[in-house]
């Protein structure tokens, strides 16, 4: 039985003070109810230290939204895995659709980041997903399979990798893939992992759904056989909503 994982991606929201307050509210709202699954929050870089201190001692994990694939150097505006590790991050989100869309990340640069995260002793959340055009043209299976293959190129052991399926057309739009649509793609992803790493690895890998998950639809989505939790955007900015989603996974 795969242990479900729910991560709140706060994106570019909340000041440090607001982030600290929200983190405290999340811990309080969850109480000890998330022990059956993993729950994490991904604040902005400036808030990582403060949020990390706030959630210390709780079961809530600290997650980073991105990283660079070099250890250090002349890379203005970037943050290394060593810096994130020192702050206590357990996971790093890699290849989010917004990073691919707005900042030109490719499967190749995603792959470099995945390897760097694993080498630093953290776990990676590999994001994959199709656009509306790719969905409507029927290319979504090929697109997602290519992203999985490219992101994991040269990665021998995927035990520290979570895959997040995020239909780009359902992120921040209020639209949600039906539970059946989401399950279909999650199964495609699991089959691709089986092709690359074998059935035992495919059975063990956790695949999150990330596309406008809300308290009202979380339980139905998480009941699907190949959906192992969620990567939560907007709903993660309200402690009670996020806690309700986590509890739906537990």
UniProtKB/Swiss-Prot annotation:
It is found in: Cytoplasm. Substrate binds at residues 9-11, 172, 212, 233-234. GO terms for biological process: gluconeogenesis; glyceraldehyde-3-phosphate biosynthetic process; glycerol catabolic process; glycolytic process. Keywords: Cytoplasm, Gluconeogenesis, Glycolysis, Isomerase. It is an enzyme of class 5 (isomerase). Its main location: cytoplasm. One of its GO terms (molecular function) is triose-phosphate isomerase activity. Its EC number is 5.3.1.1. Transmembrane segments: none annotated. The active site is at residues 96, 166. Pathway: Carbohydrate biosynthesis; gluconeogenesis; Carbohydrate degradation; glycolysis; D-glyceraldehyde 3-phosphate from glycerone phosphate: step 1/1. GO terms for cellular component: cytosol. CDD domains: TIM. It catalyses: D-glyceraldehyde 3-phosphate = dihydroxyacetone phosphate. The keyword Cytoplasm applies. It holds the Pfam family TIM. The keyword Nucleotide-binding does not apply. Homodimer. Belongs to the triosephosphate isomerase family. Involved in the gluconeogenesis. Catalyzes stereospecifically the conversion of dihydroxyacetone phosphate (DHAP) to D-glyceraldehyde-3-phosphate (G3P). This is Triosephosphate isomerase. The gene is tpiA.
């Amino acid at each position: 039985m795969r242990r479900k994982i729910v991560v709140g991606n706060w994106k570019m929201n909340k000041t440090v003070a607001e982030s600290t307050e929200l983190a405290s509210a999340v811990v309080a709202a969850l109480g000890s109810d998330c022990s059956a699954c993993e729950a994490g929050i991904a604040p902005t870089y400036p808030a990582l230290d403060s949020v990390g201190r706030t959630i210390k001692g709780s079961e809530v994990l600290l997650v980073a939204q991105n990283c660079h694939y070099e250890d250090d150097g002349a890379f203005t505006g970037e943050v290394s895995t060593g810096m994130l590790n020192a702050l206590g991050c357990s996971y790093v989100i890699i290849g989010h659709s917004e990073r691919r869309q707005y900042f030109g990340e490719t499967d190749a640069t995603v792959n470099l980041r995945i390897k760097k995260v694993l080498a630093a002793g953290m776990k990676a959340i590999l994001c994959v997903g199709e656009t509306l055009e790719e969905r409507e043209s029927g290319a979504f299976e090929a697109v997602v399979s290519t992203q999985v293959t490219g992101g994991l190129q040269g990665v021998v052991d995927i035990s520290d990798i979570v895959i997040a399926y995020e239909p780009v057309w359902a992120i921040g739009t209020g639209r949600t893939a039906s539970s059946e649509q989401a399950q279909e793609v999650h199964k495609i992803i699991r089959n691709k992992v089986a092709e690359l790493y074998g059935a035992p690895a495919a059975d063990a890998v956790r695949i999150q759904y990330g596309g406008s998950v809300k308290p009202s639809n979380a339980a139905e989505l998480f009941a699907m056989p190949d959906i192992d939790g969620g990567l939560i955007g907007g709903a993660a900015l309200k402690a009670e909503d996020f806690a309700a989603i986590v509890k739906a996974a537990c």
